[in-house]
Amino acid sequence: MYLRVTLGPYRGKSAGIPYVMEIWPIKCGSIIHNHGNCYAVINVIHGAIDIEIFNKQESDHNSTNHIMKFTAQKGQQTWISPNWFQTHKLWNSTPTYCATIQCYQYGKADTTYWPYFDYVSNDNTIDEFLPNSDFTFSDMKKQVMEKY
């Protein structure tokens, strides 16, 4: 699990709101999921995050062997394109939290806007989830300012 903070409105050209800050607590991360042929940039702004890359998902938990694994650290970026790195898992294995900023968008020629991320569920079917927000950036800022 992680905290997902969005900035701006849903524009219809990405799965969910296109500008996202994610805060990854220690020993927390995402499930293996697919980004539906979008482009993305992931920028690490604090800590480090392990990223495992997988082939496109199938309804078979035995197909979850990663094909590549690397760690992105503060100041480093990685990317996703329709043909590269679409299916991945992010995990914070460091002794501190990690924070990332992501930007998502479908390509100009892509007219199919899939609003979901796909993942393999516990019953071995391909399921989908809508990438929701835990807070908008302004809501998070307001709550922080009220406390401090």
Stretches with model-predicted labels:
Residues 89-94:
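Asparagine-centered strand-capping/turn motif at beta-strand->loop junctions
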